Structure formats: C-alpha cells, structure tokens
Amino acid sequence: MTDLTRLTIAEARAKLSAKEITAVELTDAYIGAIEAANETINAYVTVTPEKARAMAKASDARIAAGKAGALEGIPLGIKDLFGTEGVHTQACSHILDGFRPRYESTVTQNLWNDGAVMLGKLNMDEFAMGSSNETSYYGPVKNPWRAKGSNMDLVPGGSSGGSAAAVAAYLCAGATATDTGGSIRQPAAFTGTVGIKPTYGRCSRWGVVAFASSLDQAGPIARDVRDAAILLKSMASVDLKDTTSVDLPVPDYEASIGQSIKGMKIGIPKEYRVDGMPEEIEALWQQGIAWLKEAGAEIVDITLPHTKYALPAYYIVAPAEASSNLARYDGVRYGLRVDGKDIVDMYEKTRAAGFGREVKRRIMIGTYVLSAGYYDAYYLRAQKVRSLIKRDFELAFQAGVDAILTPATPSSAFGIADEDLASDPVKMYLNDIFTVTVNMAGLPGIAVPGGLDHKGLPLGLQLIGKPFDEETLFKTAHVIEQAAGRFAPSKWW
C-alpha cells in the first residue's frame, strides 16, 4: 500500500468513503510518522494517540453506518492556541504550564462535529507573537525544506510554524492555524503549503487564546487549495459566543475550485514594490501575473497609498491589544505560579518567569502606546491609519477589482537563530510587510506556492479578496496552483 500520509484530504476522503482504507489505518499512519519525525521537526508539543485512535474508531463506525461527516476520519493537527477540552493548551508559553481547558474552541468543535480526528497540538510562537516559530517555550520548529546542498536548519515561519511544518512533512493531513499579521500566510509561503486567512468574523474566535482581538482570525493550512477549501468550510460558522463572528451562510468553497477566472479583474498594487525587494520575488510576482493573464483575467494597476504605514501602525495596534489581553495571566487560577512574599510580588514573579522575551517586549510596547501621555500620539493615530488602509482597499474593489495579487513574503525561509534578525527585532517584523495590511483591513488573504528560488526553497504568492469572498480567492489560487505545480521537500528528517 502507498504511504497513506501522502494522500491529500480530498484523496483520503474518497478512499475512506469507498472503504478502501479505514480511519484507524490512516490515523495510525500519521501517528507512526509523528513518532519517527517529531523529535527532529518539533512540530507537535502534545501528541494524543489514544484520543486519535478512539476518534478514528468512531469515524469508521459512522462510515459503516452511512453517517459520515464532511471530514470523517481525516487526521488533523491543532495549533496550541485553540482550546481543546482536557488536552494541554499552552499557547506555547511557560505561563500556561499545565492548563487543560474544560471547554472546546468553536472551530475545533466544528471540526470534530464533521468527523475529523485530532492527532495533537502544534508548536507555535509564544502567544502567536513571532514570524519564525523561535519564541516558543518548546523551542523552534525546523522547516522540512532545506536549501540545495545545505544542512542548515531553516525556520518554517510563524506564528503557525508547527502547523505549516507538520503539513509539509506529512505529519497531519491538514492543520488549524491563526493569523494576526500574517501567521498563516507567511509560514505557508515558507513551507510550500497553502494557507488562507479568512475575512475577520468568518471563523469564531471563541476558545482561541487571544493575541490582538480585532486582528486575530482562524484559518487552515493544507497541502493544496482544494484541501484548504474543504477545511475552511468546516471551520467557519457564526457563533453566538463570539459577537465578532458574522451571521452569513458558509459557501461550499470546494465548488469554486476549477471555475474559470476569465474576465476577472486582478489588481497589482505598485506600493508592494518595496525597496530592497529581491529580484526573485519580483520575477515570481510577474510570473503570477502572466499565469492569471493566460487564464483570461484582466490585469490592472492599482494604488494602495497607505500601505507604507501598515507595518508601523500594526506594531502599535497589535501590542496595545496584546498588553490588555495578557494582563489576565497572573498565576492565580491556572498555569504557572511563582510564590512571592505577597500577592503583588507573586504576580510580578509569575509574569517575569512565565512570559518570554518577545512577549514581554510587545506587552511593554502596548502598555507604552496606551499610556496617558502617548495614547493620542501613537494608538489613536495608528487607528486612523488603519481606517485609511481599509479605505484604500474599498476604493480598489469599488473600481471593479475582484482580487489583488502580491508576493506573500519578501524572501524565502531564513536560518534558525539568524544573528542579523535576532539582534534587530524590526528586521524580523519586516517579514510581515506584505501580509499585515490584510489584517488591518479585515480582508481575506490566501498564500499559494508559486515556485522555488535559486536555493530550491519555496516562494509564495498572495491573493487578497473582498470581504467574505473567499470563493474568488480559492478559484484564483487554484489557477496559480495548476500553473505552478505542487512542491514537496526532499525527506532528510
């Protein structure tokens, strides 16, 4: 039998439905792959083999009874940000040591309702703060990709680095992830996988550990566009427990795969041609434009004049919200507690020991920009810029543009513990330069592999869509995928 872990979700679904394989066989194949590779890749922080086998057994029973759900028997990895009832949920932070929620996040509950199987919890940047998966309390994740002729370990991107690496290394059929400033799309681009950040409000945030509440959005990382569409259909829903979730019908995203894009208008924003952008990224962008033109799309130049202010505005708004959200972690009711001489001393010692360096940095930035003397100068101004960024997109879409094409990242994956980036946080933050505008405007964005660079590492293209028009992104991304082909790393782990 061929390696079952190589099956896409769509292929596995067909084989399960035809009873050519069982959910238990498929799950066991992934558990075996995790046992063999996780010590090297470090994608999983918690593995749940007993739970997975029990869920798979129940899936087989439902398939036999003709009651299969949309994801029946499909083994998935869950980012450690999603609350999973009775299963360690730590946001990869020391401060949440030992926390086992008594609740299930809405997104994961939706997946289990559709028959999916949980393999375990995936590594990530601590509290989703990072672009390289190096801020995790559990240590960095290794990208399954390596440069040609090199043994250097590369980052998988962040914050959903565990999700992207697990999908690329065949350690799950698909994964949940979250995106606050690019945390789905950037790791997808770095690992040759597909990741979609849906419109803000498309997926419930209930039960997901908060980073920046007005920016966070859950979405899937998958091996191809069709699989991403299948997963998002199950993840998305309105939720009365999350007032920011939107009560709109969830389309059959998979039905949009293969549809023609003839006559569609694709916008190309000149502001995304940033200083110092590598020639390979520009060439990839031009190749993407050519593919869409060949498929019958009309290419139009557009302007998004406030793009250059997006990154500084994001790094004011996101830390401000994070400093408020993370104030709740004090060691009183759950997680880490470091004893002190009194309650204030206990708070201080717990937070000092529990939060990592990058999280502390962002809490301090957030507290500073919200302080009385700086609120107007920084936070209020950043929110005004955010409104202008959103307006730029609205004007482009009002002018008839159906989707916008940009690069997903300014480079391919870089090395773990890169000294240049470690010494300068701003250089690390620049990894988000093409992605943060989408979060600031609350729009959907998808990253799809476009090719390999001169080192043999994957590069991604990004498509940005109108609010709640993920269908257009899926059908357009599928055109790129068909033209570019699919990419998989050579196994070294």
Swiss-Prot record:
Family matches, as InterPro entries: Amidase, Amidase_CS, Amidase_dom, AS_sf, GatA
Class of enzymatic activity (EC top level): ligase
Superkingdom to which the source organism belongs: Bacteria
Assigned keywords, A-Z: ATP-binding, Ligase, Nucleotide-binding, Protein biosynthesis
Record keyword Nucleotide-binding present: yes
Gene Ontology cellular component list: glutamyl-tRNA(Gln) amidotransferase complex
Keyword rRNA-binding: no
GO biological process terms held by the UniProt record: translation
Residues spanning the membrane: none
Active site, renumbered: 79 (charge relay system), 159 (charge relay system), 183 (acyl-ester intermediate)
EC number: 6.3.5.7
A Pfam family: Amidase
Alphabetized GO MF terms: ATP binding; glutaminyl-tRNA synthase (glutamine-hydrolyzing) activity
Catalytic activity: L-glutamyl-tRNA(Gln) + L-glutamine + ATP + H2O = L-glutaminyl-tRNA(Gln) + L-glutamate + ADP + phosphate + H(+)
Complexes and interactors: Heterotrimer of A, B and C subunits.
Function: Allows the formation of correctly charged Gln-tRNA(Gln) through the transamidation of misacylated Glu-tRNA(Gln) in organisms which lack glutaminyl-tRNA synthetase. The reaction takes place in the presence of glutamine and ATP through an activated gamma-phospho-Glu-tRNA(Gln).
Family under the similarity heading: Belongs to the amidase family. GatA subfamily.
The protein's name in its UniProt record: Glutamyl-tRNA(Gln) amidotransferase subunit A
Species this chain originates from: Sinorhizobium fredii (strain NBRC 101917 / NGR234)
Gene: gatA
